[in-house]
């Protein structure tokens, strides 16, 4: 083999090797590009998933907060109307009492008899506000006759209306004032207000 042939052979081999290196580099570059795209897609999906999860969490939190606020507002409104209902009832009773209306006199007598009968003792003391004590004084004999008990009047108390019955020895008491009756009926008032405002 001559010198020229040897040179050509060397050049051909070098070119061939260079082409192979170039092809390998291209393949490596393609693999790197594909890997980078895959990783970029994974990162993109992860970011979107995280954003969706955070948005859903935030949405649920906002819904829960809104529901809580609605519930609190309903309770506030309900409580406000319950208080108004009780205040109106008390005011109505005050008006009836001040006017000396027949309805109130009947209510007071019934309250007194009910309270006296709730005491097991035969000697009972009735207490009420000053105005009601004067009214009770006029109906005391009727209360005694209807209950068959020795009933007397005691010291005045702070109350919208109605009576408190106590055994003479102080061992028993039954609060039948308007305030106490309204407290006992509070659950019924709450139910009625709830039905009126919220349908149940």
Swiss-Prot record:
Main localization of the protein described in the UniProt heading: membrane
Compartments in which it is found: Cell membrane
Gene Ontology terms describing biological process: proton motive force-driven plasma membrane ATP synthesis
Entry superkingdom: Archaea
Signal sequence extent: none
Disulfide bonds: none
GO CC annotation terms, alphabetical: plasma membrane; proton-transporting two-sector ATPase complex, catalytic domain
One GO MF term attached to the UniProt entry: proton-transporting ATPase activity, rotational mechanism
Membrane topology: Peripheral membrane protein
Keywords: ATP synthesis, Cell membrane, Hydrogen ion transport, Ion transport, Membrane, Transport
Known partners and oligomeric status: Has multiple subunits with at least A(3), B(3), C, D, E, F, H, I and proteolipid K(x).
Family: Belongs to the V-ATPase E subunit family.
UniProt-listed PANTHER family: ATPASE H+-TRANSPORTING V1 SUBUNIT E1A-RELATED
Described purpose of this protein according to its UniProt entry: Component of the A-type ATP synthase that produces ATP from ADP in the presence of a proton gradient across the membrane.
Protein name: A-type ATP synthase subunit E
Lineage: Archaea, Methanobacteriati, Methanobacteriota, Methanomada group, Methanopyri
């Amino acid at each position: 083999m001559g010198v020229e042939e040897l040179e050509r052979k060397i050049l051909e081999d070098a070119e061939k090797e260079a082409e192979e290196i170039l092809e390998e580099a291209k393949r490596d570059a393609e693999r790197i590009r594909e890997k980078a795209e895959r990783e970029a897609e994974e990162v993109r999906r992860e970011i979107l998933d995280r954003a969706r999860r955070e948005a859903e969490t935030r949405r649920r939190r906002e819904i829960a907060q809104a529901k809580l606020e609605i519930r609190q507002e309903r309770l506030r409104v309900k409580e406000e109307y319950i208080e108004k209902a009780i205040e109106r009832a008390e005011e109505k009773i005050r008006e009836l009492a001040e006017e000396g209306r027949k309805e109130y006199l009947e209510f007071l007598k019934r309250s007194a008899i009910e309270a006296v009968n709730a005491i097991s003792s035969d000697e009972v003391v009735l207490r009420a506000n000053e105005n009601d004590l004067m009214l009770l004084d006029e109906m005391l004999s009727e209360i005694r006759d209807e209950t068959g008990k020795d009933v007397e009047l005691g010291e005045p108390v702070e109350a919208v209306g109605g009576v408190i019955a106590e055994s003479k020895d102080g061992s028993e008491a039954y609060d039948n004032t308007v305030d106490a009756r309204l407290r006992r009926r509070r659950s019924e008032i709450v139910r009625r207000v709830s039905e009126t405002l919220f349908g149940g």
